[in-house]
Amino acid sequence: MLILTRKVGESVLIGDDISITVLSVRGNQVKLGVEAPKEVSVHREEIYQRIKQTKDEPYLASS
């Protein structure tokens, strides 16, 4: 795991197409801005887990 320290307004680049910028810090909450191509899905972890769980659940057959 790469660990970085950033200040408000500073960014981290992932590859050539993805930029994550620190927008604000208030207490223990950090607001991030993510710029990525439309074909790259960007989700909060808890939302991604729900999406993954929904895809993994078998569909119930109606009788």
UniProtKB/Swiss-Prot annotation:
Keyword entries, A-Z: Activator, Cytoplasm, Repressor, RNA-binding, Translation regulation
Gene Ontology annotations for the cellular component aspect, listed alphabetically: cytosol
A GO BP annotation: mRNA catabolic process
Primary localization class, coarse: cytoplasm
Molecular function per GO: mRNA 5'-UTR binding
Superkingdom assignment: Bacteria
PANTHER family in the cross-refs: CARBON STORAGE REGULATOR
Function: A key translational regulator that binds mRNA to regulate translation initiation and/or mRNA stability. Mediates global changes in gene expression, shifting from rapid growth to stress survival by linking envelope stress, the stringent response and the catabolite repression systems. Usually binds in the 5'-UTR; binding at or near the Shine-Dalgarno sequence prevents ribosome-binding, repressing translation, binding elsewhere in the 5'-UTR can activate translation and/or stabilize the mRNA. Its function is antagonized by small RNA(s).
Oligomeric and partner information: Homodimer; the beta-strands of each monomer intercalate to form a hydrophobic core, while the alpha-helices form wings that extend away from the core.
Family: Belongs to the CsrA/RsmA family.
Protein name: Translational regulator CsrA
Organism from which the protein derives: Haemophilus influenzae (strain PittEE)
Organism placement in taxonomy: Bacteria, Pseudomonadati, Pseudomonadota, Gammaproteobacteria, Pasteurellales
